[in-house]
Amino acid sequence: MKSLSRAGLGLIVLACATRAVTAQEISGLVADREASAELAKIVATVRQNGLPLEPILAKVQYAVMVRSPAPRIVAAAHAVAARLEDARSALAPQPTATDIVAGENALWSGVSRKSLEEVRKVSPNKPVAVPLGVLAQLVVSSVPEKKATKYVTDLIKRGATSDQLVALGNDVNAEVRLGTRAMDALEVRMNRLNAVLGVPGANGDAASVPTSLQSGDGKKKP
């Protein structure tokens, strides 16, 4: 499983996303003059490109907190800026700032650009920050990315609410931390959702759901 510090930083990103960020606020966190000047350039470029600055602030704050050297802080800020651009492109045509932030965090968590595009494909006209956050959480919890993407996109198509998606991610994460295998925890939670949403029908969606979930009894067939 990936480190908890990664998941923790994701929470910092979402918390910072509720307010505006200034260039001075970011560059001023680093005492090294050269690094501070480089951070100011990164911030200016990100702002000029119309991308949210909050993830960069979160990254720099975290790096300073753990006493990372200045060059690593600058490199990390560059990487965040690149992921923000990649996330916006993958979530085109009109992602919200929150979508972009969630997309950047997902990419950092090990989710591929292709998976971001798959989520956008099944939800072309709605915000996707919550599904992307849950997808990232499942991947961090050691659910294979392709399977996690399949489950999340299937749930979107079947009308799962944001609360249901969030509960799924939180429950799986909690079970994994207690020692349960990620896929076992996911199947149990999916089975419960099937009871609410209905078992996938014969329209092709069922192919993405394990047989144990289609049976409705929560037990794997031999």
Question: PLM features: residue spans?
Answer:
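N-terminal signal peptide c-region/cleavage motif recognized by signal peptidases
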Residues: A17-A20
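General marker for long, soluble alpha-helical cores
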Residues: T22-P222
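Bacterial N-terminal signal peptides that target proteins for export
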Residues: M1-L9
